[in-house]
Structure formats: C-alpha cells, structure tokens
C-alpha cells in the first residue's frame, strides 16, 4: 500500500471513529433529556433528603472535546418555621465568657470601618448578628466630624456578622432612623426604626423587611425605643417606646405587634417614674425589661410583661446596689417602688440585668460617675429583696478603659439547652466627648458575652485602639 493509500485509510478510520463518538454523544444527550423530563413529570414525595447525581462523559476526537453532564438535585427536608414560645426559664450562670469581640476601632485605623453607636445583638433560628445605628460615614472619612450627635438624617440601622467590624461591604442595610429595636418571632423578623424631627418623629415598622405600619409621636418630644432587641412569644412581639422629656415626666407605652402590626398598646402602669432604653429578655411565657430612669433613679426600673394576657406592670430593682451611671454610693437597703436619687452628674446610661432569684446578675460601669469600666455582679434576689448584697463580682472591662451602653440578648433557638442561656453585650465608645483632644468622631466597638454553668477565670476586654494613631 503506497503512502497516499495509507493516508486515505487512516483518514477513513478517523472519520468513522468521529461519527461513532458523535452518535454516542447524541444518544447521551437524548437519554439525559428524557431522564430530566421524566424527573420533572414525576410527583415529588415529601421529606426527601438532599441527593445529587452527577454524570460526566468526555470524548476526545482529535483535540475536540464533547462534555455531557447530568445533574439531578432533590430539595432538602426543611423544618417548617414556627412561632417562638417562651416556655423555658433562665439558665443558672456561674460566670461569663466572651463569645465575640469585633475590634472595630482598631481595624478602623487603616480599614474603611463604618461609624456606629447604639449597637446590640439579636438572634434568629439561623444564628446571631450585631445590629447598630450607622452615621452615614466611615471613621477615616471627613464626614465623621460631628458624629457625636445622636439624631441626624444620615443614620440608619445595619446588621453585620457577630464579631466582624462593620464595613460597607459586609453590612446589611435595614431601615433609616436614629433609634431602633428588632426581634424575630420564629417565622419572621420585626424591626422598628424612628426617623425625622425631634418634635414630630415617625416610627416605621417592618416585618420581613416590608413596611407594615407607621406610628406617630404622642408627646412630640423625641419618640424613642429600646436600642436593643425586643422579644416575641407565640407570634406577638412586645416593644417599649417612650415620648417626652428626658429629664422630667415622659410618656411610655408597651406596644404589642403581630407581623409588624399593632394589636394592642398600654400606657405605662406601676410605680416606675421614668422609662427609657429597656433591655428585655423572655422566660416562662413572660418578658422582663430592665430599663433606664433618666429623670430621678440611680436604681433601674423594670417592666414585667405577661405574654398570655398582654398585661404589664412596673417597679424598680429592689437592691440597694445601684447600677445606673452616674450614681451615688451603694445603699444598705434599696427600694422596690421608688427611685433612689442623688446621682452626682450625668443622669443615666442604658443597662441590663437578669433577675433570676438566687442567680440574679446585674451589670454596671465600674466608675460611678463616667462610662468607664464594666463589671457583672451576682446579687441573689436583687429583684425582690431590698437588703440583697453582692455575692460575686466579675470584671469585664477594667476601669482604665471606656465602656458605654449595654444590653441583654438570648439565643432562644439553642435547642441543646433546656433553659435560656443569658447573654449580654457592652458598647465600647471611643472618640468624643472623652477623647476630643485626638479626634472629631464618636464611634464604638462591641464585645458580647454569654453565661457559663461552670466557674470561669478573669480578664479585661477593652476596645484596645490607640486613639493617638488617628490624630
């Protein structure tokens, strides 16, 4: 066979193989299409587990690639969402451990970190996030000048992964406003933001990110809400809102919502004289809120809400161990019904406590005059016994470092616990007014802690940024 004949013979064989592979490819495509149509036409059974079948056929024909892929995916078995029921009591706590620290100001020296204040933590069935009111700027941006002001048109609520400093890329915008609260009922999240003028603000209410209603002011003097998470039971969420003077008589309401709509509202009942910035937690089909009396009391007022009757009452934490800032010295005996006066300077700061009988813990700044340091005090029966005293103390932030607002939160969807493990956060404020020598801005980082059923060691967890680096 001469060379030309050999060439023709080899070419013929190659063409035959190519045609054969092409026919195989076409048959594979036809088979895959028929299987896919059969799959779509077959009624899916319930409670299917996630199954993925991947078939790859690759044929090489003289550097030509033909790929056939079949992917059959079945939906996972997802548990239907249900309303949260507050059927558990609080867990017993022997000490507190840090679960998150975002170091936002330290990162902000070189990264584009958003200026925030009034942060808090709130959880849902998928986990916990940090929420905070941003100032419409980053720390290194010139617009950060003047962010000491609480109420501007540039503020809004954002959420970020817990323990991660807020940046433009990782922050999820939620609503416009300068006061907020947010909570999940097990099915959806309700959020309230307050915006507008001091004398005519508007509360906007969202459920699953859709605007559901608005609320007008009733005293036309800085309508405001909790600055930490609200709490829900069986589809009803309770929120404490105040309108009126910060230094004299104000007008507080306990409002009840279902899917973002008001179903009931009550004017404040009980003996509390002034209510602001409540930190609330749920237990035993009830909600307990530990609040701020910005008018008279260095002892904290509390609101107790029965979520079965949607009724509430108010009074004061009974112990003489005072937990607002500023405050006079601790008293040998407290008062369950009346404010304890005598604060030496600024009238108050947002705070919290867990009133759990013998396992009651209260948080406060270490300094009685300024927002510096932070400590947790175990005071058995502080909520009911005027003569209760400190049994244990745990330092969270040493008194050489700034603190700020603090509040409670609970992961109600932690199914590994037969009780609700109490948690709290501390805002670590930096910048103005305390550090006006170095910077023009005011912002914060955050630490979050949860209870441990076992004894813990010691440690201080300050913000840690060297403020002079920002000069």
Curated annotation (Swiss-Prot):
Cofactor(s) the record lists: Ca(2+)
Keyword list, A-Z: Calcium, Disulfide bond, Glycoprotein, Glycosidase, Host cell membrane, Host membrane, Hydrolase, Membrane, Metal-binding, Signal-anchor, Transmembrane, Transmembrane helix, Virion
Active-site residues, record numbering mapped to chain: 150, 405
Subcellular location per the Swiss-Prot or TrEMBL entry: Virion membrane; Host apical cell membrane
Catalytic activity: Hydrolysis of alpha-(2->3)-, alpha-(2->6)-, alpha-(2->8)- glycosidic linkages of terminal sialic acid residues in oligosaccharides, glycoproteins, glycolipids, colominic acid and synthetic substrates
Cystine pairings recorded for this chain: 91-419, 123-128, 183-230, 232-237, 278-291, 280-289, 318-336, 423-450
Residues that coordinate or bind substrate: 117, 151, 276-277, 292, 371
Gene3D superfamilies linked: 2.120.10.10
InterPro entries linked to this entry: Glyco_hydro_34, Sialidase_sf
Residue span of region Head of neuraminidase: 90-471
Membrane topology: Single-pass type II membrane protein
EC number, as in UniProt: 3.2.1.18
Keyword Membrane: yes
Record remark: domains: Intact N-terminus is essential for virion morphogenesis. Possesses two apical sorting signals, one in the ectodomain, which is likely to be a glycan, and the other in the transmembrane domain. The transmembrane domain also plays a role in lipid raft association.
HAMAP family in alphabetical order: INFV_NRAM
Stated name of the protein: Neuraminidase
Gene (name only): NA
